Amino acid sequence: MSSEAKCPFNHAAGGGTTNRDWWPKQLRLDLLSQHSGKSNPLDGGFNYAEAFRSLDLAAVKKDLAALMTDSQDWWPADFGHYGPLFIRMAWHSAGTYRIGDGRGGAGRGQQRFAPLNSWPDNVSLDKARRLLWPIKQKYGQKISWADLLILTGNVALETMGFKTFGFAGGREDTWEPDLDVYWGNEKTWLGGDVRYGKGAAGDNDDGGVIVADEEKHGEEVSRDNSGRNLENPLGAVQMGLIYVNPEGPDGNPDPLAAAHDIRETFARMAMNDEETVALIAGGHTFGKTHGAGPADNVGPEPEAADLENQGLGWKNSFGTGKGADTITSGLEVTWTTTPTKWGNGFFENLFKYEWELTKSPAGAHQWVARDAGETIPHAHDPSKKLRPTMLTTDLSLRFDPVYEKISRRFLENPDQLADAFARAWFKLTHRDMGPRARYLGPEVPAEELNWQDPIPALDHPLVNEQDIASLKQKILASGLSVSQLVSTAWASASTFRGSDKRGGANGARIRLAPQKDWPVNQPEQLAKVLKVLEGIQSEFNGVQSGGKKISLADLIVLGGAAAIEQAAKSAGQQVSVPFSPGRMDASQEQTDVQSVAALEPLADGFRNYLKGKYRAPAEALLIDKAQLLTLTAPEMTVLLGGLRALNVHAGQDSHGVFTHRPQTLSNDFFRNLLDMGTEWKPLSPARDVFEGRDRKTGELKWTGTRVDLVFGSHAQLRALCEVYASEDAQEKFVRDFVAAWAKVMDLDRFEIA
């Protein structure tokens, strides 16, 4: 045998000690290159919207309805109906959404991939997706997994007698796990020590991004749990859960304490108390939980399972391992006498009985109705009946005083429950889809909802090229500076989040509460700029014929374009910034202030802005912002350098403006940052602001933040800066800046995409 044959082959590509092993805090630029075309197997010209429009949705729903009662021996349906399993699948696909950063949710079909496919809260959902495969296989790319998971939940409800509010397609699949979502920093499943141990804030030791305050440490926890402070932006109380522990906080079976966790986690998913009660009660009208035996009978999750299991996990050695022997959550609860039929049985049982604490066969805390007969059907043996049971979190709806009032109203008014659940379910499953312009299909509801951030439909002729040129001249002659115009346009457009497709310049909500008062937008300067632009708008619209108008939303973006063209001209470059009119102005009545408040940037490195102190360094928060703006590393780099040259910053400090000719679109930021004649030193132990002095004379040249200096410190970013700092780079710099700028301005223009 040759020496090569004897030698163990341990140098496969990607193996060995990695850069992240050596430097775990290294900046995560890879967050800006995920979901590229290299991971997508579909043809480059594939258009999912067109494919979905060709889909026979009624035929898909018919096939799904047939599947509901087509019980398979390898995974038998509880009560002969897969509906409850598919409701849980859809709920858990959508329920990872959190309003804080818009990440999570159903929009990209991420339940197929790690870590979600292996979360403890998603046990057995691998089987649900395998049950769906024949239907996905039949319709191919006309319906994404992301859409199919949600549609299946709707059909499940409808086949059990519930009238849903509607369904919209349009969720495009991704083909690899999300890298940007911070799920927490615990190292064990169901851990919660970090998200609560550090108060309201946490830091991701693995180099990911988290925006969280430094404050709120170690408060005393009261009986109602109000002293618990879940770190932002997390929406679950333990690693691997969707929301809360159904046994109660950390397994403590206290309904009142559990109510605090429910309220906090559902609020972070943008749900109010009524929506929360409706969702829990509506969901628990159907099906059951599974805890037939001890958890040590359950094998590894899908990502840790053996190859021969073919992506299925949690192999169960208890009894038959399925059907009546299923172990999922460890709880063994069936809520109603009709678990495959819509009704008000959940609330009827909740208030009819007094409840005693007991344990499931798996040893989990749950509740059984005191002095109750056996009225609940068995999921797999029609000859057996069971006593009514509830979860600790179910009892929260009765014993929390606010939830109790809502619950009693729903008990007495089943029609109100049905309407509230239908609307809350639609919101749950569509919250991360963005505006209605992205909705596809014949079942899109006609009603416009404020949480969709509605914008009026275009109702007037648009400005033409001649109008645009004239308006640019008026804007530049208005007395507003280049930096003021660019700052305002950036502030308007950069609220966009690629995560949940919210924000952006369309709607001109920058002139409305709460955006007009955000510190990052410099309210006094903003009011001045808006007043001037409103005057130009009024004058222009007042002399047009045929109903032609320009919206303030368009004029804000056009002002930024005019200013950039002027700044490029000052640098000796002629450039035309792309501009597509058609934005409309939203009203204050169309703006949910509390919901829009979640879009406020706590950090915007492009404007050198930090609202507070965060454990994540400023440069990591820049990556977070760039990722939400769907920018690549080169786009982020050229945008930041250009904005610094244009003197765009929040507040009075001019950190990072490394140029002696501000408001000129030059590559000075890069040239001066890379100048070895400058020596940098921190101004304080916090190391958040630095001064750059001439190495020979000691003369102060510049001041900069961590965000500025990372472009010279980080090897990859420095390599990008070197491109734009080169002698032959000015033209390329302007061209690339304009392209990246135009991309940001149009991120929310789904109607023209």
Swiss-Prot record:
Q: Does the keyword Coiled coil apply?
A: no
Q: Which CDD domains match?
A: catalase_peroxidase_1, catalase_peroxidase_2
Alphabetical keyword list: Heme, Hydrogen peroxide, Iron, Metal-binding, Oxidoreductase, Peroxidase
Listed binding positions for heme b are H284
Keyword NAD listed? The answer is: no
Q: What is its EC number?
A: 1.11.1.21
Q: How is it modified after translation?
A: Formation of the three residue Trp-Tyr-Met cross-link is important for the catalase, but not the peroxidase activity of the enzyme.
Q: Name the Pfam families on file.
A: peroxidase
Q: How does the cofactor attach, per the note?
A: Binds 1 heme b (iron(II)-protoporphyrin IX) group per dimer.
**Self-association or partners: how does it assemble?**
Homodimer or homotetramer.
What is the name of the protein in this document?
Answer: Catalase-peroxidase
Q: What is the lineage of its organism?
A: Bacteria, Pseudomonadati, Pseudomonadota, Betaproteobacteria, Burkholderiales
